[in-house]
């Protein structure tokens, strides 16, 4: 399955509120084609050294493309940051619920244990979705840059991925990995407690 179709399928399955924050892969593909068309052929902007930023910056269509790419990147990165922070808060809420349920001095209804277990499962699922969001967007930026290089004859992908993408929080997300491990442990702890 082509990446664009795969991405559309994943977006369809994800939280609808996240829709605007995914990379707009289709739009960026169109921009590449417009960049090539505007510059008068796939190799016109690549008449100098193919990865020299000075040569690339002289081509207006290239400047527009990379400005749009950075806008997409900022949008995705900002959303990931706020979602990751929200996950930290949500984990603490589920953890606090577990501690309250363990407290024998507090009265609990018969469904409290089941609700807490369901909350833990929902939280885990949401963190997995956020990890998937990070991975799919990273792949999207990589693919769009490879496509750009193929169509324009430039060699910008590797440099952009190393110098720009690697600085973004969603490209390496240790906090998400830690949250997944913590929630797995919490789930086991909840399952193991006396009802």
Predicted regions located by residue number:
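Phospho-regulated, Ser/Thr/Pro-rich intrinsically disordered or coiled-coil terminal scaffolds
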Residues: 1-150, 155, 160-161, 166-170, ...
């Amino acid at each position: 399955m082509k990446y664009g179709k795969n991405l559309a399928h994943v977006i369809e399955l994800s939280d609808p509120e996240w829709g605007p924050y995914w990379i707009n892969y289709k739009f960026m593909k169109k921009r590449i084609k417009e960049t090539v068309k505007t510059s008068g052929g796939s190799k016109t902007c690549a008449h100098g050294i193919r990865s020299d930023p000075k040569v690339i910056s002289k081509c207006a269509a290239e400047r527009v493309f990379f400005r749009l790419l950075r806008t997409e990147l900022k949008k995705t990165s900002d959303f990931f940051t706020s979602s990751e922070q929200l996950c930290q808060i949500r984990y603490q809420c589920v953890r606090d619920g577990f501690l309250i349920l363990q407290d024998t001095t507090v009265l609990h209804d018969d469904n409290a244990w089941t609700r807490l277990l369901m909350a833990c499962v929902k939280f885990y699922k949401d963190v997995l979705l956020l990890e998937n969001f990070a991975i799919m967007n990273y792949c999207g930026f990589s693919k769009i840059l490879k496509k750009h290089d193929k169509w324009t004859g430039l060699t910008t992908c590797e440099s952009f991925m190393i110098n720009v993408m690697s600085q973004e929080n969603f490209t390496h997300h240790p906090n998400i990995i830690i949250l997944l491990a913590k929630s797995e442990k919490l789930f086991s702890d909840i399952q193991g407690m006396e009802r």
